[in-house]
């Protein structure tokens, strides 16, 4: 009974937007990549907010509700719609260009897998971006000029179009949730409360 009550409480909080839904979580984001309908990078805008720390006012990353990030160790593992410059742009200051290209390629493959059949301009813009973006020419791109040092420092980036943030698009959200609940590579199990199969993380949320 206690577990069932906790489950109902969780679902109520989720519906009210007070906690993240399964497959989603709070992520610190520093910049938004604005894409045109053809996938071209039009500009990069800081989404950092001013915060008071002690006697100083500093710029801090904005916390957004995004697809749950992967747990990285030493291998290459891309995140969906939000990552650092190595994965989304194919450039960083780590001095390992071959590995950085592997990161970009992995990120491109993930987005092609999840967005290929999504009938939404935002999804198609992201696909077009990955298919046309040239990491070797990235540092020369005018959109990066103003924030290049901060971007290479490792902050997270997200995609945005004229419609808004891509991760907030209903069709894109559905694509991610379908992938997360049925096509993840991690261990799976049956929830004792709902009887639904899903990633172990989903089942543990109910306990």
State each model region's role.
Residues 194:
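Short Cys/His-rich metal-coordination motifs, predominantly Zn2+-binding knuckles/fingers
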Residues 197-201:
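Short, non-ligating residues that shape and space the ligands of small metal-coordination modules
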Residues 1-189:
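Conserved phosphate-interacting/catalytic interface
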Residues 205-207:
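Conserved small/polar residues in nucleotide/adenosyl-binding loops
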């Amino acid at each position: 009974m206690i577990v069932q009550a906790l489950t109902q409480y969780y679902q109520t909080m989720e519906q009210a937007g007070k906690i993240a839904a399964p497959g989603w979580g709070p992520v610190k984001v520093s910049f938004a990549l604005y894409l045109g309908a053809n996938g071209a990078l039009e500009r990069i805008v800081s989404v950092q907010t001013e915060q008071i720390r002690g006697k100083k006012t500093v710029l801090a990353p904005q916390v957004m509700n995004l697809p749950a990030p992967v747990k990285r160790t030493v291998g290459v593992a891309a995140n969906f719609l939000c990552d650092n410059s190595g994965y989304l742009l194919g450039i960083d200051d780590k001095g390992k260009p071959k590995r950085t290209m592997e990161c970009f390629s992995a990120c491109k493959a993930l987005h092609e897998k999840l967005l290929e059949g999504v009938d939404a301009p935002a999804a198609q813009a992201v696909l077009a971006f990955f298919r046309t973006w040239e990491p070797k020419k990235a540092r020369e791109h005018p959109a990066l000029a103003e924030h290049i040092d901060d971007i290479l420092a490792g902050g997270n980036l997200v995609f945005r179009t004229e419609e808004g943030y891509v991760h907030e698009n209903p069709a894109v959200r559905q694509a991610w949730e379908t992938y997360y609940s049925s096509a993840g590579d991690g261990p799976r199990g049956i929830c004792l409360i709902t009887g639904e199969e899903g990633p172990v993380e989903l089942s543990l949320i109910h306990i």
